[in-house]
Amino acid sequence: MSRYQGNINWNRLRNALIDATPVRFIFIKSTQGDSYIDPKFRSNFFEAKENGFLRGVYHFWSNKVSARRQAYFFLAMVKLQPGDFPPVLDVENKPKDMTTEDFQQNILTWLHIVEDRYHVKPIIYTYYKFKQQYLSDQRFDDYPYWIAHYYVNQMEYKGRWKIWQHTDAGKLPGIKGYVDLNIYNGSYYDMQQMLIPEPAPIDSSAISDSTSYDSLGVQSPRDSA
């Protein structure tokens, strides 16, 4: 979901069914490169959760900007919360003048920076043939995949995948025009286990009497005015 879907009628969308099955999750475009933010991102991000959908956010990869600049721009613009899907990197093309090894290293740089922030493996979105040709290196094996593969009755990719985007010409009440439709590979319970978890509680027993105030992130008495 992005600006291309225009203004969403969320009252209609939250009651939408696909083959008698409710729509459970929505992925929203946030950023592209190191300077573009989708004009509908903030409203779509808010409304998705407000209307009861599990939500995810994707960054559209640009080959014109460094991986580090893109990763830090995404992290500055997007504040995911517990209960959201892990961040998504949408990567669909490789420069002709770049080696596959260099391209893969750039993608891994983005993934590692974002993973360090959220402590979850980002999702890689790409299409079937691109995955086979450019992202088959074993360094990507631990990342969850969201594969676009249209005009087939079932996913032909034989590796592990989490989400299948099976059409780019879906129709849903509340959305004008076409929208991509996706299927999660597992149960609703399985899908919930994939979401960003709540932070682990602090183990107070691990804090000794000698622990300094500074290490707890509060102001120590000696610095008080």
Language-model regions: role of each:
Residues M1-L111, E115-V120:
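Substrate-binding cleft of extracellular glycoside hydrolase catalytic domains
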Residues P86-P87, P122, A148, M155:
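Proline-rich low-complexity regions
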Residues H59, T126, H149:
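Short beta-strand/turn micro-motifs composed of small residues
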Residues M1-Q5, N11, S136, F140-A225:
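Functionally critical loop-and-helix segments that line ligand-binding/catalytic clefts
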Residues H119-Q132:
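Aromatic-lined carbohydrate-recognition surfaces of secreted/lumenal glycan-active proteins
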Residues S35, K64, K131, Q154, ...:
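Flexible, glycine-rich phosphate/dinucleotide-binding loops
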Residues P95-D97, F130-Q133:
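Short, solvent-exposed loop/turn segments at secondary-structure junctions
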